[in-house]
């Protein structure tokens, strides 16, 4: 007899008989257990609700683009700045090494000729200052001439109508006169400055000529050293200007980045404020009556009185005697008894308090027992004109 073998599918297969492989595609898969990486793209992407899509501010995308652009620019410019600084330091070290080597070969003639080249440098700077002072003086002279022309035009306008003084022309004349005075002061200041720097330039030129006559031999020997130094100085100045420009670009990019962040923060605060202000107030549910044992407010007392009156009207159809008394006073006694019961229900937490009222009122609308029923029967026989009432609370 073939030995049975339990297989994972739950079916017993005789030994020697192969069970067909279960096709993986036929096995039902739970939608939760599906591959999280490949098919979960839709679940991984957060879908905004219609309300969030409506509240999505288009300025957010614009500010995010500005933020990304500023961040990319900061990274690129900082890389260029690091390269420029590295190049500047490398050229500085190389120039110092070459100048030291050249100076060791030439000897003491370099120190002897150094005052001459220093005087030449000062003379060149004085010459540049003289040119700037000349430009400022020319600008002041042109402004003075324009102000004088304005005064002439204003005087012609004031004198056009001799019988009437126009306040507009008078104001224009006063303004032009002030401009003439200011331009005159600026022209005089520029003239004095130009004369001062011109004297300094002449003194520097005279010193250069004197040193050139005195140190002619040392100047000739040290010329290669100072020419090489001038070349390296020019190269270093160019690289220094490039480094300064890149630093300014980095500062501007960081400023734009900060502005974009600040704008995003302001937009976020506006959206949150709009959401807080646009939320509907919490809906008020139906009013709940005060629980047993709680003191009723004025509104609850009014509701209780109306309910008692309704119960009194409904109790005309059911039979339960409220106590002996004449027929005209029965309604008044019934109303007082019902109000007493209602106040006791509102003040007392225990049902034991209601046992003493069982002779007068049935709380559940049913017969209270044989004793109370007999009493009602005897009372009903004695006084036939009494109303039969039953109150269901």
Curated annotation (Swiss-Prot):
GO terms for cellular component: cytoplasm. InterPro entries: SH3BP5. Residues 1-58, 273-332, 362-393 are annotated as: Disordered. Residues 317-332 have a biased composition (Low complexity). Keywords: Coiled coil, Guanine-nucleotide releasing factor, Phosphoprotein. One of its GO terms (biological process) is intracellular signal transduction. The modification Phosphothreonine is found at residue 13. Residues 384-393 have a biased composition (Basic residues). Residues 59-140, 169-272 form a coiled coil. Residues 297-306 have a biased composition (Acidic residues). Residues 18-28 have a biased composition (Basic and acidic residues). Belongs to the SH3BP5 family. Functions as a guanine nucleotide exchange factor (GEF) for RAB11A. This is SH3 domain-binding protein 5-like. It comes from Homo sapiens.
